[in-house]
């Protein structure tokens, strides 16, 4: 007998198959059967409701919000069960303590996030590297599956400081960026994200650091 049966819902399974009425049996946190008259220790009446796989939102900017809204309510309230953050190169790690201000101002300009909220809502003193950021997120937990890219803009600011807004990286700086990204990937980043969009302007209205990079350095 399963732990839970979701009873009588309309199944939309995402395969393109016609919707149908059925029960869903869940055991040990996994779906083990879909059919009729299934038995379970507990039942959830889904009559009149759709039962479907959780949606995956591949483009979010929850990098900071995850700390003050671990339920990620704009997504979880709409059937999303997996989110991807760090898009467009705007992760909030890696980050040096002295770089918090410029990174927060960058996000304020490009993503319309409140500087004050970013300043007090993120535990900046708990992380510097990208793996440390993921550990800080994990300590608090999230309601959804949470994956995050390591960002190009964040990486350039981490290695180059303010000059990331002004020029391309030197060969030595590129080597340091490669090491930072490799560390992030080994520590749980799901990939590397960048942006060359002309709409992405950051601190003081300047093009974000990833736009200043050459295409060669974008493939670090």
Where are these regions (language model features)?
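Histidine-rich, glycine-flanked metal-binding segment
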Residues: 1-5, 11-54
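Divalent-metal coordination cores built from histidine and acidic residues
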Residues: 68-191
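Di-metal (Zn2+ and/or Mg2+/Mn2+) metal-binding site signature of metallo-dependent hydrolases
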Residues: 51-74
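A generic secondary-structure micro-motif detector
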Residues: 60-62, 123, 170, 211
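Short, small-residue-rich loop/turn micro-motifs
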Residues: 48-50, 150, 196-198
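Flexible loop/turn segments at secondary-structure boundaries
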Residues: 13, 63, 90-94, 154-157, ...
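Divalent metal-coordination and catalytic microenvironments
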Residues: 9, 24, 29, 48, ...
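Functional cores that coordinate and move charged inorganic groups
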Residues: 166-171, 178-185, 189-220
